[in-house]
């Protein structure tokens, strides 16, 4: 059984991170921006797992840290969606351009 080289994992992680970064910087829908940020976090998790599995000293530290990162990402998504729902109820829009003013 052949093993997948580390460069394939790292290339995939770079591609995922770049797609997420491009989406987070160019899209105007807040839900899409949150999804793109989650995609970037998943690319980082892929790097953590790849380096912990295929590094010079393989151990499970990167995999455990990746699990903690997924838990934090789930909490971040829940809080982000709750804030988005509250903003939508007040402004009736989910576009980033229209959420830049503060009420005083």
Curated annotation (Swiss-Prot):
Its main location: membrane. NDH-1 is composed of 14 different subunits. Subunits NuoA, H, J, K, L, M, N constitute the membrane sector of the complex. It catalyses: a quinone + NADH + 5 H(+)(in) = a quinol + NAD(+) + 4 H(+)(out). This is NADH-quinone oxidoreductase subunit K. The chain crosses the membrane at residues 4-24, 31-51, 67-87. Its EC number is 7.1.1.-. Pfam families: Oxidored_q2. It is found in: Cell membrane. GO terms for cellular component: NADH dehydrogenase complex; plasma membrane. Belongs to the complex I subunit 4L family. GO terms for molecular function: NADH:ubiquinone reductase (non-electrogenic) activity; quinone binding. NDH-1 shuttles electrons from NADH, via FMN and iron-sulfur (Fe-S) centers, to quinones in the respiratory chain. The immediate electron acceptor for the enzyme in this species is believed to be a menaquinone. Couples the redox reaction to proton translocation (for every two electrons transferred, four hydrogen ions are translocated across the cytoplasmic membrane), and thus conserves the redox energy in a proton gradient. The gene is nuoK. The keyword Cell membrane applies. One of its GO terms (biological process) is ATP synthesis coupled electron transport. It is a multi-pass membrane protein. Keywords: Cell membrane, Membrane, NAD, Quinone, Translocase, Transmembrane, Transmembrane helix, Transport. It comes from the Bacteria.
């Amino acid at each position: 059984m052949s093993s997948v080289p580390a460069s394939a994992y790292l290339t995939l992680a770079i591609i995922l991170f770049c797609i997420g970064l491009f989406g987070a910087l160019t899209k105007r829908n807040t839900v899409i921006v949150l999804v793109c940020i989650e995609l970037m976090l998943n690319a980082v998790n892929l790097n953590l797992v790849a380096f912990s599995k295929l590094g010079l000293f393989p151990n499970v530290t990167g995999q455990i840290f990746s699990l903690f990162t997924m838990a934090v990402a789930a909490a971040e998504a829940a809080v982000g969606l709750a804030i988005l729902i509250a903003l939508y109820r007040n402004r009736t829009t989910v576009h980033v351009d229209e959420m830049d003013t503060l009420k005083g």
